[in-house]
Amino acid sequence: MTTTSNLPEQADIVMIGAGIMSATLATVLKALEPSLKIVMLETLNDCAMESSNGWNNAGTGHAANCEMNYTPPRPDGTVDISRALEVNTEFDLSRQLWSYLVKTGAIPDPQAFIHPCPHMSMVWGADNVKYLRQRFKEMSAHHCYRGMEYSEDPKQIAEWVPLVMQGRSGNEPIAVTRIVSGADVDYGALTHLLIKSLTEQAGFEVHYLKHVHDLARQRDGSWRIGIRDRGSKAQQTIQAKFVFVGAGGGAIELLQKSGIPEGHGYGGFPVSGIWLRCDVDSMSERHHAKVYGKAPHGSPPMSVPHLDTRIIGGKRSLLFGPYAGFSSRFLKHGSLTDLFRSVRPGNVLPMLDVAKDNWPLTEYLVSQVLQSAGHQFEMLRQYYPEARNHDWTHAVAGQRVQIIKPGTDKVGVLEFGTELVTSADRSFAALLGASPGASTAAFIALEVLQKCFADKLTADAWLPRLKTVIPTYGVDLKTDAEACFSIRKSTASVLNLDYV
């Protein structure tokens, strides 16, 4: 049932935010226990209107195939691929969940949200080529990256990505890696599919135009959620046994409103982004890949430049960027006062400490803000030398709010990943951060289960059903090559992806 008013007085679970994270967790919970009464609250008038929206993110099936920030070089010249392996196998969990939903009919057609798309890394210059060659050597030796290809041959690279090589000087060394089993994902379309399926089930409601302004823990351990209807301005409340905050950049404020001790000292640092977008068919049809470069020094991970195939609403386009910037908004539809309202006595010192220790990031963001349109286009031409200005338009990306938290050996730490903050009594969970984000939504949902519903993960409760939804739950795909190959072949078949 989908409504914009008539809130129930009570629910088992309330989810704040109607993006990919809440939709995924609700889907998993209803699959495990269909009798659960779940209410989802969204302040806007539809789901997936912030970072989950197709044009608000890069849509990379984020498997750490091409993102070089996950594979830093060591001082001895070798490459650390441990973080890449973590992200790589986390994406397998999402593929398994989506395959389950396709097989059960909850998602009628996977091509409504996912398409095969090669993932490529590209560098130029002798030192960078040396790094990529070593990276390929180490990654291709691991079963998780079976099928990875490498080339320094301009002719071969031109066959794979002609737009990237056309018009490029042959004087500078260039190298690429390619994995053909990658994907382009429209997380906005996926969120709509998940919520549509949920609304067809008894015990699920999504309510739009509901702004959560208060969270209060009750004596019995439940939560009273104070809500203002953005249309009628009426005040409403709902009581829930468990609250999940999947509100993107808005999660910081809601974590603070909850008052849980575990959230003390947390703050956020917002980073905005701009894409260049090309909808010219003659261009987009000649580029079939996500080509990732190396991030500029001092830049945040989500600012790695890349030239991507995007398929949104059945329309094929090109995307380049992002160009980072600074906005004090925590959400794209948020307020310019978001950052300032988030400052509390408990987080002001961590925030000041982070500001002091991250001058390269500050300088990078300032340089991006001051960058002219001409400078932005010159960056695109490093990846597409013959790009023409009139073929491209600007598109504003979703806001990314990086985590600022108290450190163990310093006052404040800036983190670029995601983090789940949960209460000691397991009645509250808030998801903070940005990258890798949507692609690991299933992994995050499992983390919520393990931290907040551990008593249900037993053989006589949810565990058998969970292994139907996620067949490799409890299996380490980083070490079990046979299980890795088997599940990837299976999910590729169901999702119409390439398998090597």
UniProtKB/Swiss-Prot annotation:
<dbReference type="Pfam" id="PF06039">
    <property type="entry name" value="Mqo"/>
</dbReference>
<protein>
    <recommendedName>
        <fullName>Probable malate:quinone oxidoreductase</fullName>
        <ecNumber>1.1.5.4</ecNumber>
    </recommendedName>
</protein>
<keyword id="KW-0285">Flavoprotein</keyword>
<comment type="similarity">
    <text>Belongs to the MQO family.</text>
</comment>
<dbReference type="InterPro" id="IPR006231">
    <property type="entry name" value="MQO"/>
</dbReference>
<comment type="pathway">
    <text>Carbohydrate metabolism; tricarboxylic acid cycle; oxaloacetate from (S)-malate (quinone route): step 1/1.</text>
</comment>
<keyword id="KW-0560">Oxidoreductase</keyword>
<keyword id="KW-0274">FAD</keyword>
<dbReference type="InterPro" id="IPR036188">
    <property type="entry name" value="FAD/NAD-bd_sf"/>
</dbReference>
<keyword id="KW-0816">Tricarboxylic acid cycle</keyword>
<dbReference type="GO" id="GO:0008924">
    <property type="term" value="F:L-malate dehydrogenase (quinone) activity"/>
</dbReference>
<dbReference type="GO" id="GO:0047545">
    <property type="term" value="F:2-hydroxyglutarate dehydrogenase activity"/>
</dbReference>
<dbReference type="GO" id="GO:0006099">
    <property type="term" value="P:tricarboxylic acid cycle"/>
</dbReference>
